[in-house]
């Protein structure tokens, strides 16, 4: 990115999105120069200089900076005419000026009315000197020479004698020093010395019995065939009616609510919008119109799989971050799940997320009308790479109900750190219903659906 100016690029993006932008670019010892820059020559030079040049300046010395930066304009060269090369070299970037860093954070913390971003200019490998400061090799430096270590010690005033330097001893200030007192005060004010992660929620819930979902478990009547996607929606609808656990359910959609037959939930629980619904939806005269509400429960993310997955992760880790159990159900076209947001799915595993991912319209034959790019026959291969992701590809409605119920028992009652992935179909066919006693086999992945007819055996 040496040909560009990343800070100005980011500033434009954040300001365009309505953010408050604070730029921390230059240290305090630049202030006298800027005060004497009556015609704006130094400011213009700063704006015209590319990021690649700024890196090169800090990879050399004061004489180089004088010639190749200030020397680009006679007016700026005159500004530093009475400064030594050492003084020129000592001109700091804003991110290395403690007072300005404090002032920037104070300004950000004091701002009201919107989010604030700090764009801070620093030096790669700051403090390493010739061993890596401002150099691309800073990332590859595995060890420092004795001279480089001595420079680092002197640069940061670390009180270690030359005789001890070859051992590279760990330095810890005495407990009664201002530095240590400050650190202890801040840690206590921030709640402790080590980052803490809650592994179990103090809340507890009892999952409704499997019989609660009998509408999904029973055989379908002749002429009333359904898909496994419809089976999921019926299960979810029933779960939402549970007085205890229902309010903790977080249905998440990314644009496909009507594709999955979930529009009935618009009226039942509404779509969450912190501002309510300021417009009249075009389908207002319908029973299942698009209803947004401040108290809505559905998260409708638009065409934004990464946003939907991020919302899912937030709810799926609420047991740890908020000590509050939430049960997110995120449904999407299965081709746009692990294939598109695989890194987030892996991160969810790292974070010990608990919840359900539902890959709708799965398979290679049920969504050709929208193009081959929708044909998913491999999301389970990707899901299988995440150790705590438990995946199923159910065929029948009762399997969906048994698996979802089992997942609730594990994640809500037992608080196991796993999450579930189910692929769902949109093809309607007859559902045989649950045969008593097969629940455990369904969870294991194989069960006897029906006896064979005793036909001729192959030799």
Where are these regions (language model features)?
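Long, well-ordered, tryptophan-enriched scaffold segments
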Residues: 2-219, 441-445
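Short gly/pro-enriched beta-turn/loop segments at secondary-structure junctions
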Residues: 11, 111-113, 386, 415-417, ...
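Thiamine diphosphate
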Residues: 75-95, 99-103, 110, 168-442
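Short, flexible, glycine/charge-rich loop motifs used to bind or transfer phosphoryl groups or to couple energy/partner
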Residues: 108, 382, 448-451
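C-terminal catalytic subdomain
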Residues: 132-135, 140, 147, 418, ...
